[in-house]
């Protein structure tokens, strides 16, 4: 045995030295003890990163890093303990425990107690009993072989003594269990004991089956897996202090009041080897949401706090809970006052799945999927409070099933990023590890460190990244494919976002959702996102009190679908919020994704951000370093992977929708379709071109036949204006919307909190939401068509849809926004989308019979009412800009007669017309930019720059918007340019002048918009094309004044003064453009190499340049001009007009330049803004 210890010691030493050992004594010793550990030479020892990716490692001592780690900015580490070799043929279980427990682990300088001393440990109530209980456990777990079906945990089938229901406990608590209970038999020969009065479920569904839990309906909101129920907590001292210490520190899921579906393995990620084994393993019974759909929804967020008296009897506990909602959902307004972060999303899955048979298979929900909702923060105060829990707690009788649960733990996540970038403060990490080693508390330390404390306030999200500094442990899991020789520490389930956690220094880790509480997600959405563009076309009250209250109890056949849809809707919303969160100086996209607190103070000390030299100024040098390029590419890949995952998961459930179309509630359908709107919003928000997401979204919407609701709206034309008290009286519209009807036995009908007929109301009311969703998707289709120049996929006209479907009565339950002023801002964004839809539907390139100078006066009339009566907003001004641009195009193209081939005479009246259109266009551009700069120049969510609360609805406020239209402020803002010697311009820019227009426009302060990047691109394109026109027109005016009379001369001087002001505005526009940075993830280059078309008045200095984004380089003519010329010449015979046109061209160079600008502006509208 001394020889065995010597071999183990040498192996540990060689591991610490990178696996290098040339000692003959070591080789002889390994040969003599081949049954224990075989020495590995340096040639077969790869660093942890290369081993994880299974690539060749060329590590050398003189270099200190392999080529792979050097390329990825990582460091080579050899922290992983090699796996033990398999036992010899004569291996028996009776001899395995003493031999195994005597092998010393030199990584943590601890020794494992032998199996013979485990009984003495049970009676020892010292502080170190927790570790002894962990290491003395001899219950073997199910071996994980490839393509094997895991048996369910044994403890689920062993009858409970005294009728005590089984509870899901920490594996560390198994030390108190008598060794002769279940450890004496081989696991495959243990007799099967079925629960009494319960059906037999499938193998893969037992751990998430509600029949296994045997929960009282009144306990469904407060039952805790690790925090024992009152009936089991009263016997803690009877079994020893070890388990009291374990549960006291919140080892499994944190005993701070987590719900029953927050399992230990749900909050923690498996280790390197364990996760790899799970990846290789597949289940024979597919499942939509394997293990627990409920454990996926909250992801370690703190929920209901533990009862105040945990030692009270169960009967008394049930009396306290009789007043609670017996269902697994509750309204936001019904939450307990001391628990503001209770999740309305996670409540939908509080009861688990009834069965897995016949469900849809999902790879992300398979047992091989890593945990998604991870723990990233630890509150030392809470840990201390948890450690001081009352002693009246019972050590659970059986707890070995958690090891089996951990093997089948499911949580969907597959977004990778560099773990080096997830590392926190290394100095603090060392202290944490030292404390862990001294406490030697095994399972009780790591989960309490890694159990997530949800960020319950948006201010906390801004103060530090979502989640505090994570912690790690250096102990890695060692397991054998044959048997468990030693009970591994719970460090094997370290959080996937912790420092150097279960994936040590590898290049892949997982994005953790669930770091923002669900209440904060909803509040953040309605505060910062909804006013800019309504992704969820419903007010907050109805959403939280009706739409999200979906029953997921097993009485429904489609509860899996409900939980699955709500889960990925929540994940998509959190992805948007994290992308939109304002980054702190020195921060990165990883801050908002994984919640690692990065700051300039410790940014220079983390590996992965520098390779050779430390940066003195991280904020400045990062932009010029090569690491910045790598960081940008990595951030983009992480974002794309996260977006694609959310999109793929929500698409995978569509076949299930078609199978259960009549049973699925319209609530779930609204949430499901809103998820597609949400994903398209994210694409538009970051300015990323992904036509596949939009195309599949259109396909899904067409599968639901939503277009029929817009094409044939006559049966339910009065749905929009229907108030709440008339819901029961509207009985029409069923024939046209049969696609969205729900069965009479659907779970969606269960809602005792509302009126009896609240869920049985006519489906026509939900059809209003479906119409809105279709209009929103058409808006994103139009936006992508305008931005990237692609064809529009939805050709149904949405003209007038804003008034018909969105501007409904505020008293209606289905209203879009309850605040009148905020509703007007929302409608302006929708009107912008409506205008873009009409512009894309009437493109010249898509309509061969149209002439180049088409009239859009009808589109202008659409916005006449809103332009005059609404508070100033970016969407409203951009609508004016698009209309002014098309009017300006018509004005410029009318200077050339394409039929006769001659230019018009440049008279004073024509020059005045061109100058007025040009000055108006430039003035609107400046107003757009200054308003963006004042409201939200970075288009980010900043909790320190919140939107103001709108005043209460009263007659004074109702008259506010109307009064603004006739106020001199609005008139001055539209008519008088800010540069006309107006000193109030800079006050308005800085928000110092609090007049009516400023106050009303401040309602959009801090609001994010999906149009921000597209608006900036279009503004820049127009500015680059027209910025030289004022100079050219002034030259023409000055030349023409010599031949004009006195009256014309005065008019020319006024035009020159007006054009001079426009030149000053162009300078301001150029300056403001550099101050607006709405870009996220992807960098957009605004200063494209576009040369001015009016560089001079001679044909030799003029440059006709096409956008380089066409991919064909520079050309001398406009794309649209060439296209229309070909159409015209193909339909008519060639004439001799080009000769006359040539003469006219030589005489009217300025006119030709203006016409060329008109063609280029038309190219911009037809080919895309980006």
From Swiss-Prot:
Q: Where is the composition biased (Basic residues)?
A: 473-488
Record flagged with keyword Nucleus: yes
Carrying Phosphoserine, the residues are 202, 205, 208, 229, 283-284, 410, 414, 1130
MF terms from GO for this chain are: DNA binding; DNA-binding transcription factor activity, RNA polymerase II-specific; zinc ion binding
Pfam family for this entry, one: Zn_clus
Q: Does the keyword Transcription apply?
A: yes
Residues passing through the membrane, by range: none
Q: What SMART domains does the record point to?
A: GAL4 (SM00066)
Residues within the DNA-binding region(s): 47-76
**Segments of skewed composition (Basic and acidic residues):** 99-108, 271-280
Q: Where is the signal peptide?
A: none
Q: What does this protein do?
A: Glucose-responsive transcription factor that regulates expression of several glucose transporter (HXT) genes in response to glucose. In the absence of glucose, it functions as a transcriptional repressor, whereas high concentrations of glucose cause it to function as a transcriptional activator. In cells growing on low levels of glucose, has a neutral role, neither repressing nor activating transcription. Binds the consensus binding site sequence 5'-CGGANNA-3', of which multiple copies are present in all HXT promoters regulated by RGT1.
PANTHER family found in the cross-reference section: GLUCOSE TRANSPORT TRANSCRIPTION REGULATOR RGT1-RELATED (PTHR31668:SF26), GLUCOSE TRANSPORT TRANSCRIPTION REGULATOR RGT1-RELATED-RELATED (PTHR31668)
Q: Give the protein's recorded name.
A: Glucose transport transcription regulator RGT1
Task: Please name the source species.
Answer: Saccharomyces cerevisiae (strain YJM789) (Baker's yeast)
Q: What is the lineage of its organism?
A: Eukaryota, Fungi, Dikarya, Ascomycota, Saccharomycotina
